[in-house]
Amino acid sequence: IIKFPRLTVGATENSIIAACLAKGKTILKNCAIEPEIKDLTKFLNSAGAKISWIGRTCKINGVKTLNPTEYSVMADRIEAGTFCVAATLAKGNLKISNFDAKIIKTELQLLKRFGAKIKAHKEKIFIKGPQKIRSIKNIKTKEYPGVATDLQSQLMVLMCKASGKSSITEN
């Protein structure tokens, strides 16, 4: 049993990978649960790993070998979020296809507060940037499913163009 003292993406990913081929059962507690970690789990399971999740606890039963597999890696949520911020900033229109909007739900709600019009339908996101970008006070980055730290700089650019004062705090 390994209990992480704080949420950490890199340590969670590396521990999962290492535990796949370790003898016996490994239990990881207080894991980061970013979508990329869940996607890594799906990939490893498709190669023969035995990984399961309950909340922030990951259970891995070690296997002797992993098998070759074909797998489509998920779309990059930070890249998609960056395009969404850019459309809001440019007051333009954007359509993103083949992307699960649920994984950036928090950021899309935030962009709505800035004034963007957003529709998410199945695997598509439609964004129309506002004519006037509203300010937002007290945005706080947080581990997933909170506002992604990796989108903080893009959001700061958007805040510079907003009417009024805005603030963001790194968690």
Language model feature labels by segment:
Residues 1-171:
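Short, structured segments at the rim of ligand-binding sites
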